[in-house]
Amino acid sequence: MKVVDRIRAMENFVEEMKQKRDTVVKLLMWEIGKNHTDSQKEFDRTVDYIYDTIEAYKKIDRDSAKFQKHSGINAHIRRGPLGVVLCLGPYNYPLNETFCLLIPALIMGNTVIFKPAKHGVLLISPLIEAFKKHFPPGVINILFGRGRVLATPIMESGKVNVLALIGHSSSANSLQESH
């Protein structure tokens, strides 16, 4: 996808996501045990984060169109996708923290393998259709199950270019070693 197409896809996704607010908030409450106010805050903070990420990406794209001079050398730096990103989200803020990993990976043009936390998987279900509607097939791949059981063989395949994980450093080190 071109830059403009990725931005448009993300803008359309977040608009549709906002329409699912009540459902996602209820699922946060039921599944994680957060109170209503905290669940609303997490949802709203996530929407704000997506908009901020879109704006930051627009700035990066604008700035990359300019030449930079450093030590007498002119350079044109273009940022691009890195490949396959494995995103493993935490359970305590399963929407916000997970999307802090997922959204930048998507907007930069990467293919994402996304495994929601074991507590917080249901809140993703109302958003799956929005992902499917606004991104091409194969760009977002969602897996459900135990992290160790799923992530280890994926990392062992050697086909993951970026590991995006919010969790304990021992988990990250173990997954890195299996790569």
Residue ranges and their predicted role:
Residues M1-N74:
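N-terminal Rossmann-like NAD(P)+-binding subdomain of aldehyde/semialdehyde dehydrogenases
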Residues R62-H179:
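Rossmann-like NAD(P) dinucleotide-binding subdomain of oxidoreductase/dehydrogenase enzymes
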